[in-house]
């Protein structure tokens, strides 16, 4: 079973998005984090669950929120390269 590793910038995106949601409603940031955790657990069980997003990346959507986890499957781990809003700044993560 592969482990999930977040790129340092993807982890920062997760924290930033959760903080924004928390300003909208108390507890919503935690709900966002829990949905991201649910998606990462699904990736561990089914690494190819996300649709092919580019030549080397896949994307799985986060339930209830307009975010996707962009990831690649390496020999030793599933690497989350971005926690990206589905409608904002497309492709900003490509250098990762």
Segments and roles (model prediction):
Residues 19, 26, 41, 45-48, ...:
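Generic structural signal for secondary-structure transition and capping sites
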Residues 1-33:
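Arg/Lys-rich, positively charged N-terminal/basic patches that mediate binding to nucleic acids
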Residues 45-78:
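Basic/aromatic recognition patch in beta-strand/loop cores that engages polyanionic ligands
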Residues 30, 68, 72-96:
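Enriched for short, Lys/Arg-rich terminal
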């Amino acid at each position: 079973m592969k482990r999930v590793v977040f790129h340092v910038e993807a982890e920062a995106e997760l924290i930033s998005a959760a903080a924004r949601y928390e300003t909208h409603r108390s507890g919503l940031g935690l709900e966002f984090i829990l949905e991201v955790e649910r998606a990462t657990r699904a990736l561990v069980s089914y690494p190819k669950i996300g649709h092919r997003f580019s030549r080397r990346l896949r994307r799985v959507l986060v339930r209830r929120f307009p975010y996707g986890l962009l990831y690649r499957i390496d020999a030793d781990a599933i690497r989350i390269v971005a926690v990206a809003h589905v409608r904002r700044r497309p492709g900003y993560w490509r250098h990762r």
